[in-house]
Amino acid sequence: MKPNISLINAVFRIACGLTIMSAASAKFTKKPWCRMHLFYIFMGAMKAGSGILRFCPVTYMFQHSDSGNNEHQNG
């Protein structure tokens, strides 16, 4: 698994992911019965994790789907 996002993009993802996680955690402590805050915590963790690993599965999928379409058009 090699990195497919830039360093600046990774730093931005880490910052946004940790911000989302901390805001959702604060809301979740006030309303633990609301499951939407738990969903936001997981989404923030996923965003921060993709920044730490510098690998985004969605970017990978789009890069490989574009290369497959070019082969069909050329061949």
From Swiss-Prot:
GO CC list: plasma membrane
Name this polypeptide is given: Uncharacterized membrane protein YezF
Highest rank taxon of the organism: Bacteria
Organism of provenance: Bacillus subtilis (strain 168)
Transmembrane segments: 7-26, 36-58
Membrane topology summary: Multi-pass membrane protein
Main subcellular localisation: membrane
Keywords per UniProt: Cell membrane, Membrane, Transmembrane, Transmembrane helix
Signal peptide location: none
Localization terms from the record: Cell membrane
